[in-house]
């Protein structure tokens, strides 16, 4: 959510140009919409409808399921008012997005793997659903569940690049190994052009020997593919959903909040890699 927000907003301070971004939620928890303060009871068709019948139905289009910048901004401002009932002034001007569209998910998506289990081409459903959006956005970011089920496989089949966040914890590298194995399987069988954009260390604690060890092991295996930027373990990041906005929006692009700054630094790195890929 923070990367998508930062890339869509852009920042002169960090040298990031604004891009048109589509953020796709493939996690049945539906946390993407919640992070932007969206009351999921107010949205129309979601990823579940698009996934289950959109490919087979000309009556349902991608744009019917997406939440645009105005809707997201209104939701964030409404959430801000609920979180700050005693303040006479309204939400700050920086509680807003532009050039960002969200394709939300909800718990109904959790049953899609069973529904699609026997369908031909089940691993390409997302790719087909997103085909009409390829020329409308500069960047499409797909947020996946942690499990390596059919939803994640669909994301890998539709994507050009994979970004892997790793918590700086003991079992992190084991889980990453399983994901890398899945990526290679998809490369061999369905999507040979799938590449690794990078690996992001998250939940990092300063002066933690464990965090240092996990980071060193990641760099030993993946070298420059590990981003220099790291996301710290932070109370402000954990509490940002209470404000109904990602932390890069709630704190706006400044260099005073360390958690917000870490995401902007990461977005700067990711933006450069994306630009290099596009130019290549």
Give the location of each predicted region.
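P-loop NTP-binding core
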Residues: 1-280
């Amino acid at each position: 959510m923070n990367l998508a927000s930062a890339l869509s907003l852009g920042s002169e301070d960090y040298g990031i140009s604004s891009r048109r971004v589509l953020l796709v939620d493939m996690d049945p928890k539906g946390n993407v919409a919640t992070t932007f303060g969206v009351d999921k009871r107010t949205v129309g068709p979601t990823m579940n409808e698009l996934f289950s019948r959109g490919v087979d139905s000309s009556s349902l289009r991608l744009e019917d399921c997406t939440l645009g910048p105005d809707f997201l901004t209104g939701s964030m401002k409404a959430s801000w008012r609920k979180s700050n009932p005693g303040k006479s002034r309204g939400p700050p001007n920086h509680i807003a997005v532009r050039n960002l569209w969200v394709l939300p998910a909800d718990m109904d998506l959790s049953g899609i793997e069973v529904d699609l289990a026997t369908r031909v081409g089940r691993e390409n459903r997302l790719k087909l659903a997103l085909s009409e959006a390829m020329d409308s956005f500069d960047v499409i970011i797909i947020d996946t569940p942690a499990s390596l089920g059919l939803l994640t496989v669909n994301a890998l089949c539709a994507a050009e690049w994979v970004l892997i966040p790793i918590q700086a914890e003991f079992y992190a590298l084991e889980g990453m190994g399983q994901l890398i194995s899945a990526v290679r399987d998809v490369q061999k069988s369905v999507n040979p052009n799938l590449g690794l954009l990078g690996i992001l260390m998250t939940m990092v604690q300063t002066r933690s020997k464990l965090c240092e060890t996990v980071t060193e092991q990641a760099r030993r295996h993946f070298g420059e593919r590990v981003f220099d930027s790291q996301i710290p373990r932070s109370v402000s990041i954990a509490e940002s959903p209470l404000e109904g906005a990602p932390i890069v929006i709630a704190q706006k692009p400044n260099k005073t909040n360390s958690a917000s700054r870490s995401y902007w630094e990461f977005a700067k790195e990711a933006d450069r890699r994306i630009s290099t890929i596009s130019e290549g």
